[in-house]
Design a protein with these regions (language model features):
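Phosphate-binding loop of NTP-binding sites
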Residues: 22-26, 64-68, 77-221, 225-236, ...
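C-terminal helical cap/extension that packs against the catalytic core
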Residues: 43-54, 366-422
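N-terminal leader/targeting and accessory segments in enzymes
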Residues: 1-98, 102
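Nucleotide phosphate-binding/pyrophosphate-handling subdomain across enzymes
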Residues: 2-7, 17-27, 137, 273-376
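Residues in the short beta-alpha loop(s) of Rossmann-like NAD(P)-binding domains
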Residues: 14, 37, 144, 222-223, ...
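Residues at the starts of beta-strands that form the adenosine-phosphate
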Residues: 7, 29-30, 137, 179-180, ...
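Beta-strand->loop->alpha-helix junctions that form or flank phosphate-binding loops
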Residues: 60-61, 97-101, 234-252, 307-309, ...
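Short internal beta-strands
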Residues: 30-37, 217-221, 355-356, 375-384
Length: 453
């Protein structure tokens, strides 16, 4: 679609919506920024758009008579696609794109796209580092913090775009076509948005829906859901495995990470797990996925190896903060669902005071609680899910729960309970919304508190 002169509605005034407006204006579109919350500050939104912007801001109910004149609707990922106003626009035949689709249509270069329930940011960050060491024009975008729409206008034919993609972003793509994709794992998450596990999985699978046999999709052999996807995708599949020696793919053999792209040939040892600067089997899986994607794209294995060994990990992922009075503090604020938080507990090698709870995404916490396995001395709970988690903990035979009203009260309690030799771990198994704007702010508050002790 040529966007010059087209009337485009951007739905949602968050960071992605602002990025979409900027890109659309560069493309010559007439842009309306719409948010259903009529209590938002229209002037503040205009200020974010910049002084020269001609974007019109509409808050509250969208005028039905104006719908008829729209050529396109661009959804921000935080806005559900099944809202009545969105369904009404679809019924009128108005195309509805996500911001990823918009950026892809307007941008140039090859996309390497990563999705999955957990591990996306670590894998995207590592793949971004590898590509920056191998290519001149590299953009790391998407759910990782920089909207793809902010970068699209600067991309060139030889650019590589490394994109972290959430299920929200993938549910509204149409022509988006990565050269290399990856689905890292699938566990229940965001069911409050997608309603069913099947719908969540389908959204994730969209990452490969436009790929052809000339493209590559990297999948986790140890995850039942991702393994099944190999039969449905058109792309050539490359598996990674932490438990099986694969005939073809990338796998863990003792301490060796082995890349074996062809069945008939010997594999190449990329590195040993003991040489890595990040902890845990889940991180070895993230490394394997990034290595497989880079190698499939044609990056030299020596460049990959050097990049992997230099990689220090990602903020808010089992991040060492400090040792205070013999107690080690870890920030795993990115543990926003039970499966991710299990990885945090598994990485602990000390008795642990655990901070859990937050926004209710309709998760089940039994498996998370069962993973405590004698490591967790106390579970300090906050947020909307604290009573539910306490109930489920009791059902699992864990009774050392302490409920607090504020984050600071929870931290004070952890300091009181912790003994020399313990760890205090922020790995909440819940999203931060309701108490914090995002998991990054939650992690920063934790680090600020710890460093002030």
């Amino acid at each position: 679609m040529d966007l010059q002169g087209k009337k485009v509605l951007v739905f949602g005034a968050g960071i992605s919506g602002i990025g979409s407006c900027g890109l659309l204006e560069k493309e010559g579109a007439e842009v309306i920024l719409y948010d259903g919350n009529d209590k938002k500050d229209a002037e503040a939104m205009k200020a974010q758009l910049g002084g020269g912007s001609k974007v019109r801001v509409v808050l509250g109910a969208f005028p039905e008579e104006e719908m008829e004149s729209l050529d396109l609707v661009v959804m921000s990922p935080g806005v559900p696609t099944d809202l009545p106003v969105v369904l009404a626009m679809k019924e009128k035949g108005i195309p509805v794109w996500g911001e990823i689709e918009l950026a892809y249509v307007c941008g140039k270069g090859d996309v390497l796209g990563i999705t999955g329930t957990n591990g996306k940011t670590t894998t995207t960050s590592l793949l971004g580092e590898i590509m920056k060491n191998a290519r001149d024009s590299v953009f790391v975008v998407g759910n990782i913090g920089t909207p793809y729409t902010n970068a699209a206008a600067d991309t060139r034919e030889d650019s590589v775009i490394v994109a972290e993609l959430s299920s929200f972003q993938l549910e509204s793509i149409h022509t988006f076509h990565p050269k290399v994709s990856a689905v890292l794992n699938i566990t229940p998450d965001h069911l409050n948005r997608h309603h069913t596990m099947e719908a969540y999985i389908r959204a994730k699978m969209n990452i490969a829906k436009n790929q052809t046999p000339e493209d590559i999709c990297v999948l986790n052999y140890e995850d039942e859901e991702t393994r099944k996807m190999a039969d449905e995708f058109q792309a050539s599949v490359l598996f990674f495995s932490s438990k099986h020696k694969l005939e073809q793919g990338i796998y863990l053999d003792g301490e060796d990470i082995v890349y074996k792209p062809e069945k008939e040939k010997e594999g190449t040892v990329i590195c040993k797990t003991g040489e890595l600067q990040i902890l845990g089997v889940h991180n070895y899986e993230n490394v394997m996925a990034a290595v497989a994607m880079a190698a499939a794209y044609g990056v030299d294995l020596d460049v990959i190896r050097k990049s992997v060994l230099a990689f220090k990990g990602v903020e808010h992922r089992i991040e060492y903060v400090a040792e205070k009075n013999g107690v080690v503090y870890y920030n795993d604020s990115k543990g926003t669902n039970p499966d991710a938080a299990i990885k945090g507990i598994q990485a602990m090698n000390r008795p642990t005071i655990l901070i859990g709870g937050g926004y209710d995404k309709q998760s089940d916490f039994h498996e998370w609680i069962q993973s405590f396995d004698g490591k967790v001395r106390y579970l300090v709970l906050i947020g909307a899910t604290k009573e539910q988690i306490q109930r489920e903990a009791a059902e699992c035979g864990f009774h050392d729960c302490i409920l607090k009203d504020t984050f600071e009260e929870a931290l004070d309690t952890c300091v009181e309970l912790a003994r020399p030799g313990d760890a205090v771990l922020l790995s909440p198994a819940c999203a931060s919304w309701g108490m914090f704007p995002n998991y990054e702010v939650r992690g920063e508050e934790f680090k600020k508190y710890v460093n002030a002790l």
